[in-house]
Structures are given as structure tokens and as C-alpha cells.
Amino acid sequence: MEEAYRQARKRGEQGRRRAISQSEHPYLTDLDSLVAQLPLGQRENVGLRDIPLEMVVGTVTKGRQSAFSCNFMPLLPFSTEFARKWSNLYDIQVTEGYRDPVIVTEFMHRFYVQEGNKRVSVLKFLDAPTVSAKVTRLYPGTWDSVESRLYGEFCAFWRVCPLYEIEFSREGSYETLAKMLGQNLIEKWPQKKVDYLRHTFLLFKRAYLRAGGDHLDITPANAMLVYLNVYNQDRLLDTPTDIVVNRLCKIWRELVIAGKNDEDKVDLVEAPSVDEEETPAKSTSGVLNFFMGKTVYSTANPLRIAFIHEFPCATSSWDSLHDQGRQYLDEHFGGIVRTEAFEDCHDPDVFYAAVETAVKHGANVIFSTSHRLMEYTLRAAVEYPRIRFLNCSIGLPHQSVRSYFGKMYEAKFLLGALAASMADNHRIGYHASVFASGALSEINAFAIGASLLDPRAQIILTWGDVPAGGLAEAMCREGVSVMTGADMSKSLEDPTAYGLHRLVDGKVTGIAMPVWNWGRYYELIVKSLLHGTWDETSDDNQVRAVNYWYGMSSGVIDIRYAPGLPYQTRKLVQLLRNGIVEGSINPFGGELHSQNGVVQIEGFPPLPSTQIVEMNWLADNVVGTIPQLDDEPKVPAL
């Protein structure tokens, strides 16, 4: 009895000294002081629950605060009555166990003891996982902070699946987890599903800590989501711990990125690493001589690249354009680069079979050309770490897979100016098929471009899929005379779904369209591999995702005019285009206004690229709203 208390007190002193050395509070936090200056909401009687002891972090009142170290271990000498009571409780616990629950208040997913501090201390000393407690939940008075919103999401999760152990640090994660398990946050989960999640999480947590997860800046629940995103088809309960640990080691860099702040997760690479003028086409000595001595690849040992398309190129204009870019590589690099394509790989089994075939054929690089293939691509990249994987998307923070996409907002800015110069009544239609990463920046750039030529211009925004031929009719009903569709039509059934058009007397006339030059994009990425500058893009000491985000200045984005466009109009747009290419014009520089007010005032520099990618507002001359999102990850607009 005395020896146990002395050991516990020693741990308490160690915890107290450690806290002081780290400029932290050395004693228990008391809830009364914590919430004294905070707006508080109602209290709810949660009832009798088994709660995780690691989440019991303090006491309700200040009275017993200094009797315990911040780790809940005792600090008072053994000669005190406090020590004798602690020791008696220790004896009861190791001989027969406690029968009475402690009384706690839950606040922001942590527990503070009102009655039973010494019992909690004893159980923590014995490394017990849980304690029986009567719980009263204290809600925050406001929900406008990230922390309170996260707690609100936890409460919604807890009502349908009462597990305290599951704690996320990123908004939307509880709904993501629910969807992975075929559930939601509205209907109560079957008890079998709750038990399954509890056992699965505890198994994963043991493996995660065994792999060294306590050194990472993410919760075990966050790490489990990352794991399931890669190995989502495997039941954790059926997987030996050694295999789970080995898999965690394979995705370690993904876990490191998951623990970073959003602004530290992704490196946006906006300029090619190889000088644009230094191209084989401009070398008088030919392609082979141009790369002689600059690369380890040759016609005898080519750089082998596989392209995996989501749909058949014959029916998907998006995949067809990417495949034209692939063919351009074969022609452009004169045998130093050899490619092969795999089509219609939207099914996971077909995708993984394509990867296996590409690996057998000696592929050094694999491109997957749709954001919807990222999940499969990530798992393949983890399984084949020596192969370089890239996915056509933007803003997705994966270290194992690099992303690439274009600054389509630059082209939309020009199309907006062009639309305003030709609109009859200040009303311009804009149709977006999906709410995606980059979609709002494209809408806003279009609206800003239109406002430069016509301050009274209104952008009539619509969303969603429209039947073939129906977009023009829908826009006519809105009273617009000029309209634009998506960046890329999925098929040729409805030409008005793509590009900028005039609507006059029921007739649709093309004006201009955005252009993707995927051949040029792939050329720039491949040149970084041939020249050996691929690894210069990222710092191995700084684990970050790499997203290529090239625009007009790199030649990967442009616009194409319809025949017969007045030369004065072309000249105007060309002036704006030159400004974008040279960097003297940026749609998101200077004064900006949203539907809710001023975004930034005159004289401010352009918005950072990360804010453009993750834009969450609409310009003040847009008539429309942002759709309500479910928890599906945002994807680039196609």
C-alpha cells in the first residue's frame, strides 16, 4: 500500500517537473476556472457511462487542484490523511474493485471530476482503460470556432454511436467515418455496428501506438481514417496486428501530412522546373542529342509511362484529350519516352490489374487521369513505392501521389470579359456541373472579368447535370443572351455544355472555348524526370504533398476563338491574356467583393494560390448560391 503510493507520488512529481520545464500548468485543470469567461449553453444528463480515463483531464472545482499533478498522480506526502485515503482506495481496487461510479462533467470532449478524484488517480496509476461515471454534458454557448464545431460534430456522432474514444481534429471526419461503415449521423446505429467500430478502433489504436503513432500530431481516429482511405476493402478485425503495423509504416508520410495544418500540407508548384525555352523541338541537333548526357534514359532504356483512364477514350472527351497528350509524348521525345494506355478503369479491380500490368511492363511513372481514381491510385502508390504516381486533381494532400491540374480560372477570366463585351442585357449565364476544388475560383474569375467591361453585368449561376440540349433552353428562360458551360464536355451530345455561346432568337452560336493542352503539361512533367529535377520539387526533410498547378504562362491552358469573332474583340482579349501570361494582371488582386461584403480592399496583392484553390465565396455580381455539400471530398471541375 505504502509502496504503491510512493510510486504514484514519484510519477506525480515527474509530471509536475516536466510540465514546469515546458511552461505548462503543473497541476490539474479545474473546469470552473476554464469556463469562467466563456459563454455556456445548457447542461444535459448523459447518465451512467464507461468513459476513457485518458480523457479525464481535471477536476470541476479548484479545491483539490494542487493535491494532484497534471497527470492526476498524487503530490501530498504519505503522512497526510489524503495519502491514507488514496492508499485505502488502492487496496479496494486491487482486491475487489470499485462499485460506485465517479461523477464527472463533460466539456468539449474532456471530463472533469466532481466526485471521485482519488479513485480516478488510482485507476490511472493502474493503467485502467476506463472508469464508470455519471456524466453531465456541458455545452458551449457558441458554435463559431473550429473547436466548438468539431465538438458539435462529435455530439451528433455520439447520439447515434455512443463511443467517446473516437476523436477527430478535422471537420467532416465523423460523417466520413459513418459513410465508410454504411451509416449516417441521423439514425441510431445497430448495436452490432457500434461494437464492431469499438473493437476495430481499439485494435487499430494498439497497432498505431506500436508503430510509433504517439510521436505524430494526429489522433488515432484521424490515423484510422487515413488507413481506411488506403486499405478500405480490408476488415481490420480480420487483419493481424503485424500486418497493420507494416501497412502503417508504408503510409507513414501520409500520416505525417494528415497531422499538418492545411497551409503546410501542400506545395503548389506553379512554374515548370525546366526552362520553357530549353526544349528538344528547338534543338538543332535533334531530340536524342539534346538529352545526351542529361538523362539516364535512352532509346535502349526508355522512360516508360503508363496512363490509366477512367472511361473509354472513344466515348469520353476528357479521357480522349489526355490520351492525345500521351501520344504527343511518344512523338515528341523520339523513343526516349514510351507510353501505354489503359482505358475504362473505373472499376477498382480493373484499375489494379492495369497497374500490375504496367509494373510488369517496366513502368517508371503512372498517370491516372481522373480525380475519381485518386483513391485507387493512392493504394497502388503505397504498394509500389519505387514507381512515381500522379493523379489529375488539385488540393488533395497525399505525399505518395503527386497531383496536377490547370489554372482554368485564368481562361475563365478572359471568357468573362469576352462575354460582357457581347451580352445584350447585362445578364450572362454560367453553368457548373459540380461543386469542386477550383470551381468557385473559375466562377469568380469569370464574374470579375465580366465586371471589368460591364460593371452592371450579372452572372446567372446554375448547377447540376442538364439533359443534352437542355442547357440552352434553361438559360433562355433566365433571360440571358450569352452563356458558358463547363470546362470540358463529357461527350459531344450537347456542344452548348462546353465553352462560351450566344443565344439569339433560339439559335446557339459559339464564341470561344477554354483549351487544355495536356501534351504540353505532360511534356513539362516528363522533362523534370528526364533532367533529374523531379526530386528538387520537394524537400525530403519537409513531408508535404506536391501539386502541380500550371497555367497560361506554361502553355497548358488557353482559349480558342470561334471563326468570325470581330478583330477588336480578339485584340481586347489578347491584351488581357498577355497581362496574365506576363504576370501583370491577376483577377484576384486588388479590391475584391463577395456577396457578403469586402474580401480585400484596394491595393492588396493577389490572393495566395492556396486561397484561390480553396475559395469558398461568390463574387458580388453572381446571382446564385453555393450548393450544400455532403462529406464527399471536393474534386476538380472537369
Regions found by a protein language model. Give the residues of each.
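An alpha-beta-alpha
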Residues: R326, L414-A457, D540-P563
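Extracytoplasmic "Venus flytrap"
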Residues: I305-Q324, L329, F342-P348, A436-L440
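Short, charged/polar connector segments at secondary-structure boundaries
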Residues: M1-K118, K124-F125, R170-Q183, P190, ...
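Segments of small-molecule ligand-sensing domains
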Residues: H531-T537, N541-L638
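Flexible loop/hinge segments that line or gate small-molecule binding clefts
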Residues: V382-F405
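Periplasmic-binding protein-like
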Residues: G362-H371, L390-C392, V480-S489, V508-W516, ...
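Hydrophobic alpha-helical segments within soluble ligand-binding/sensing domains
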Residues: Y404-H426, V515-E536
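Glycine- and acidic-residue-rich phosphate-binding/metal-coordinating active-site segment common to enzymes
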Residues: F107, Q114-L177
